[in-house]
């Protein structure tokens, strides 16, 4: 039991840190765009232009 607990703890900690960073960055970006209507309109147009594969690849590399 002790060994299992230690292992899960270390794993969860590393995962939690990574998830926390990603979430905070996304949340901040959403807030800024939501406040101004101009930004939201621009973002919608850009998203439609980009292909899904390209967008996902860029997101993965950045974060």
UniProtKB/Swiss-Prot annotation:
Disordered, as annotated region: 1-63
MF annotations from Gene Ontology: DNA binding
InterPro entries reported for this sequence: Protamine_P1
Tagged with keyword Cell inner membrane: no
Organs and tissues of expression: Testis.
UniProt GO BP: chromosome condensation; sperm DNA condensation
Localization per Swiss-Prot or TrEMBL: Nucleus; Chromosome
Record key words, sorted: Chromosome, Developmental protein, Differentiation, DNA condensation, DNA-binding, Nucleosome core, Nucleus, Spermatogenesis
Signal peptide: none
Main location: nucleus
Record's GO cellular component terms: nucleosome; nucleus
Superkingdom to which the source organism belongs: Eukaryota
Entry's family note: Belongs to the protamine P1 family.
Primary role: Protamines substitute for histones in the chromatin of sperm during the haploid phase of spermatogenesis. They compact sperm DNA into a highly condensed, stable and inactive complex.
Protein name: Sperm protamine P1
Organism per entry: Sminthopsis griseoventer (Gray-bellied dunnart)
Designated gene of the protein: PRM1
């Amino acid at each position: 039991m002790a060994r299992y607990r230690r292992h899960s703890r270390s794993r969860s900690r590393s995962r939690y840190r990574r998830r926390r960073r990603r979430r905070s960055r996304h949340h901040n970006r959403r807030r800024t765009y939501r406040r101004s209507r101009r930004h939201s309109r621009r973002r919608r147009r850009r998203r439609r232009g980009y292909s899904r594969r390209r967008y996902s690849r860029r997101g993965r590399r950045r974060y």
